[in-house]
C-alpha cells in the first residue's frame, strides 16, 4: 500500500478521474505540490498514456492555482525514476516546484543541479 493512497481527500488540492494532487510534506519551496495517479504504479514508464495525460492535466491545474496563490517566478516540474535517480517512494509522483527569484544563488541549469558539478554548464564558457 502506498502512503499517498492513505492521505485523506481533504488534503488534496486538485483531482481528476485518474490522479490527485497534494502539497509535499517536505517542500523544497512554498507551494511544492505532488501530482499522483490513483493507481499504484512505480514510475512514469509504467503509467498508461491516459494516466500520463491526466497527470499533466493536473500539473497545469496546479500551476494555475499556484500562479494565483503563490505568484512564483518559475517552476521545476519532474519525477524521479529508480533509486539511482533519487526515487524513495515507489508510487509515481510528479513534483511541481515553484521557484522564486533569489531562492538559490545561480539557478542556471535548472534540473541539471541534481548532479551539482553539472548544474551550471555555462560556467566554463
Question: Model regions: which residues?
Answer:
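HIT superfamily nucleotide-processing domains
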Residues: 1-125
Amino acid at each position: 500500500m502506498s502512503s499517498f493512497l492513505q492521505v485523506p481527500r481533504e488534503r488534496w488540492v486538485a483531482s481528476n478521474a485518474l490522479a490527485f494532487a497534494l502539497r509535499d510534506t517536505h517542500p523544497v519551496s512554498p507551494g511544492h505540490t505532488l501530482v499522483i495517479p490513483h493507481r499504484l504504479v512505480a514510475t512514469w514508464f509504467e503509467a498508461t498514456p491516459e494516466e500520463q495525460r491526466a497527470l499533466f492535466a493536473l500539473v497545469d491545474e496546479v500551476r494555475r492555482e499556484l500562479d494565483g496563490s503563490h505568484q512564483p517566478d518559475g517552476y521545476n516540474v519532474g519525477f524521479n525514476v529508480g533509486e539511482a535517480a533519487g526515487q524513495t517512494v515507489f508510487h509515481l509522483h510528479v513534483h511541481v516546484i515553484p521557484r522564486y527569484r533569489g531562492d538559490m544563488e545561480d539557478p542556471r541549469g535548472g534540473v541539471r543541479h541534481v548532479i551539482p558539478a553539472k548544474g551550471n554548464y555555462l560556467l566554463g564558457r
